[in-house]
Amino acid sequence: MQVKTLLGATFLALSLASCSTVEKVVYRIDVPQGNYLEATTVAQVKEGMTAQQVQYLLGTPVLVDPYNSQTWYYVFLQQRAYETPVQHTFTVKFDQRGIVTETHLDKPLPQVSQQGENNTIIETGEKPKSSWWKFWK
């Protein structure tokens, strides 16, 4: 009888352990990786710009095509707290003189006004100022 009770309690404990929601209690930060791309800066890249101008706007590319050095890849991976990561790839192609001939963005980037903040400051109310001198009086 005790063996059945012990096995039943063990089975119940192990089966309920997977039903936990504790994962969402732990704070996770937003993790941007790669080149941080903003819609406003990507929109400034136009055909006819030089490679130096593109690099000034967007920074060093994450990847330069090893077979064709005239193609630059800017990769931006954004993972917000418990959401699935979203990857944006911006491709810039140059001609032999280093002039932009083509640009391609695989997914639209969120506008700056649409980007939500995960860091909210909670006001607790104002504390009255008290001096430590009151202990000496």
UniProtKB/Swiss-Prot annotation:
Subcellular location: Cell outer membrane
Topological type in the membrane: Lipid-anchor
Lipidation (N-palmitoyl cysteine): C19
Gene Ontology BP term (one): protein insertion into membrane
Residues lipid-modified (S-diacylglycerol cysteine): C19
Physiological role: Part of the outer membrane protein assembly complex, which is involved in assembly and insertion of beta-barrel proteins into the outer membrane.
Protein name: Outer membrane protein assembly factor BamE
Species of provenance: Haemophilus influenzae (strain ATCC 51907 / DSM 11121 / KW20 / Rd)
Gene behind the chain: bamE
